Amino acid sequence: MDSTVFINNPSLTLPFSYTFTSSSNSSTTTSTTTDSSSGQWMDGRIWSKLPPPLLDRVIAFLPPPAFFRTRCVCKRFYSLLFSNTFLETYLQLLPLRHNCFLFFKHKTLKSYIYKRGGTNDDDSNKAEGFLFDPNEIRWYRLSFAYIPSGFYPSGSSGGLVSWVSEEAGLKTILLCNPLVGSVSQLPPISRPRLFPSIGLSVTPTSIDVTVAGDDLISPYAVKNLSSESFHVDAGGFFSLWAMTSSLPRLCSLESGKMVYVQGKFYCMNYSPFSVLSYEVTGNRWIKIQAPMRRFLRSPSLLESKGRLILVAAVEKSKLNVPKSLRLWSLQQDNATWVEIERMPQPLYTQFAAEEGGKGFECVGNQEFVMIVLRGTSLQLLFDIVRKSWLWVPPCPYSGSGGGSSGGGSDGEVLQGFAYDPVLTTPVVSLLDQLTLPFPGVC
């Protein structure tokens, strides 16, 4: 992981350095662990006798950025990422989730020109992702050079990022762990599609994928007719792209976006706005009416602490209601929406001026909601728990100027996913017995 940050770029420090305060002659002084006589960071008489298993348990609780800085300390720390003993300890401890967002510069679907036997020629933007840590307000850069050309990112879950083949037909899906550079392939889907909506749910013991819509009924026509699902778990049960129930009539999906919440996949439906829900265990699709559906603009679905959240701008031109950006939560009856937050009006006035009617994208992870303004380099971070709004410093790695970072030039957008970095994802080993290695993937 690139440890360069956009703001408050600190010098690299050892992860176990610390300070303490002591009193002497009624004056308070602060001392560090540095030994002035030996020049060492820590007292070797203490730390050299600390049992390695105990030290490994401490390291296992470090946030991913701190863990990768720790690997620079010595050869043993560097090798922890490849140590089965350490990784088993890491999985047993289940450290607290480090909620992040992962962004990619990605072309909009309208900018793709499909050619039989070929794919999009511009793959430069797909070689890297931009990791944003909302806890520290820092940007990092991740390399995805090991992903073959002709694939685009489609989702993230359980520390894995999914990539889907661009070429129309029987789609191939790859799952990768960006922290270790591992790649696993799912079997090809069973029905030819163009740009379907794809949902991903990964737990420590199972993988679920749902692919819906954009059925190729001819080389030149698509319809939203069907969906198919993939499941594999540690209990030995697997289902390879079983055709599920048909999609609701006259649905218009937003290709590529699905959200998983408590056993269901959700995606936006257009013209008019509504929400489609697929219950995995019940194998059925239902349509949920969206709140204020005739007055919504740029609606997005996201997951927050086990709840489905709808974020959208509300514009009622013929009514005496101020324009605003609102958040609704879907209740347990799977039909009722409750407004949980509204952007303060002074902030919305500034937001609307910067957004300029070009639209925006939203992605959520636990208590954080990230709003990306199209055609600009601006992002707005909302903390649901603290009820705080913050303009985020632009990503320093995504190109100069506002157009390329937020979208607008050459049909590019900054596409984001909720991402929880983890050091190991042993569940992908379940795929080894199902597929052969993908050509060109190590």
Swiss-Prot record:
Q: In which pathway does it act?
A: Protein modification; protein ubiquitination
Main subcellular localization, coarse class? nucleus
The molecular function terms of the Gene Ontology recorded here are: ubiquitin-protein transferase activity
Alphabetical list of Gene3D superfamilies matching this protein: 1.20.1280.50, Kelch-type beta propeller
Chain segments carrying region Interaction with SKP1A? 1-85
Keywords, comma-separated and alphabetical: Activator, Developmental protein, Differentiation, Flowering, Nucleus, Transcription, Transcription regulation, Ubl conjugation pathway
Places the protein is found: Nucleus
Biological processes annotated in GO: cell differentiation; flower development; meristem structural organization; protein ubiquitination; regulation of DNA-templated transcription; SCF-dependent proteasomal ubiquitin-dependent protein catabolic process
**GO CC term (a single one):** nucleus
Q: Which residues form the F-box domain?
A: 44-90
Q: What else is known?
A: Mutations in the UFO gene result in the formation of unusual floral organs.
Domain comment as written in the entry: The F-box is necessary for the interaction with ASK proteins.
Complex and partners: Part of a putative SCF (ASK/Cullin/F-box) ubiquitin ligase complex. Interacts with SKP1A/ASK1, SKP1B/ASK2 and ASK11.
The job of this chain, per UniProt, is described as:
Component of SCF(ASK-cullin-F-box) E3 ubiquitin ligase complexes, which may mediate the ubiquitination and subsequent proteasomal degradation of target proteins. Considered as a meristem identity factor required for normal growth of the young floral meristem. Acts together with LEAFY to positively regulate the B class floral homeotic genes APETALA3 and PISTILLATA. In this way, operates as a region-specific regulator for petal and stamen development. Alternatively, may play a role as a negative regulator of the C class floral homeotic genes.
Name of the protein this chain belongs to:
Protein UNUSUAL FLORAL ORGANS
Organism whose genome encodes this protein: Arabidopsis thaliana
Instruction: Provide the gene name from the record.
Output: UFO
